[in-house]
C-alpha cells in the first residue's frame, strides 16, 4: 500500500479507480459527465490527476465515484 504522506501520492484510490473505470468501459469524460449529473463537478483533467495520484479526492467525490461506478466504497481502496 502507498504511504499516506510521501510527497507524491495525494490519494490512495488512483490506480484502483482507473482499473475499475476501464473495466466498466467508461472514459474519463464519461465518468466526469455522470458525476456532474449527481451535482459533483470533477472535470476530465481532474479525473486524470486523481488516477495518477497527483490530486486529492474529497469525501463527497469518493462517494459519488463509487455510486457512478456501482462499487462499494472500500473497493476503491483495495
Regions inferred by a protein language model and the residue ranges of each:
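Short basic helix-loop element that most often maps to the first helix and adjoining turn
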Residues: 15-36
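Conserved hydrophobic/aromatic packing and binding residues within compact polymer-binding modules
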Residues: 17, 31-32, 47-50, 76
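A detector for short, charged/polar N-terminal pre-domain segments
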Residues: 1-12
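Recognition helix of helix-turn-helix/homeodomain-like DNA-binding domains
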Residues: 37-56
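DNA major-groove recognition helix of helix-turn-helix/homeodomain DNA-binding modules
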Residues: 54, 58-75
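Helix-turn-helix DNA-binding elements, focusing on the entry/boundary residues of the two helices
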Residues: 17, 28, 44, 59-62
Amino acid at each position: 500500500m502507498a504511504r499516506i504522506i510521501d510527497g507524491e501520492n495525494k490519494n490512495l484510490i488512483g490506480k484502483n479507480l482507473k482499473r475499475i473505470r476501464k473495466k466498466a468501459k467508461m472514459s474519463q469524460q464519461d465518468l466526469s459527465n455522470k458525476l456532474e449529473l449527481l451535482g459533483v463537478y470533477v472535470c476530465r483533467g481532474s479525473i486524470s490527476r486523481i488516477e495518477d495520484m497527483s490530486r486529492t479526492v474529497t469525501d463527497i467525490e469518493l462517494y459519488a465515484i463509487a455510486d457512478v461506478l456501482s462499487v462499494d466504497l472500500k473497493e476503491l481502496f483495495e
